[in-house]
UniProtKB/Swiss-Prot annotation:
One of its GO terms (biological process) is translation. This is Small ribosomal subunit protein bS6. The lineage of its organism: Bacteria, Pseudomonadati, Pseudomonadota, Gammaproteobacteria, Alteromonadales. Residues 96-139 are annotated as: Disordered. Belongs to the bacterial ribosomal protein bS6 family. HAMAP family: Ribosomal_bS6. It comes from Shewanella woodyi (strain ATCC 51908 / MS32). The gene is rpsF.
Length: 139
């Protein structure tokens, strides 16, 4: 079996159907004895150039180990699905399991937002304590 990196773009109006599509496409590969090494749903992102007058699309990345026949079947499924705007299948030399730069950047943004949320809630708690102390002294 060979290793492949697969990226496909889904029409932004069909974003709700992406989990089902991922399940269907991974099923095609795993039924033929393939293995999914990495699966990342990057979500809706800006396109570099318009495709069919669309400026955004839903991105999905998969790194798999599969047979050539199952990858051909997957490409056929992409071709017959109108929601898939573009797809790219590249053969790689080895399995890639670490997070992609896109996923790492998203994790960093999420952790930054969480820490900012903690910082914002901390002054609010301190203000509440001061207010309670002031009310007690006023009584």
């Amino acid at each position: 079996m060979r290793h492949y990196e697969i990226v496909f773009l889904v029409h932004p109006d069909q974003s709700e159907q992406v989990p089902g599509m991922i399940e269907r496409y991974t099923g095609i590969l795993t039924q033929a004895g393939g293995q999914i090494h990495r699966l990342e749903d990057w979500g809706r992102r800006q396109l570099a150039y318009p495709i069919i007058e669309l400026h955004k699309a839903h991105y999905v990345l998969m790194n798999v180990e599969a047979t050539a026949e199952s990858v051909e079947e997957l490409e056929t499924a992409f071709r017959f699905n109108d929601a898939v705007l573009r797809n790219m299948v590249m053969r790689t030399k080895a399995a890639i399991t670490e997070a992609s730069p896109m996923a790492k950047a998203k994790d960093e943004r999420d952790s930054r937002r969480a820490s900012e949320g903690e910082r914002r809630s901390a002054p609010a708690e301190a203000t509440e304590e001061v207010t309670e102390a002031a009310e007690k002294t006023a009584e």
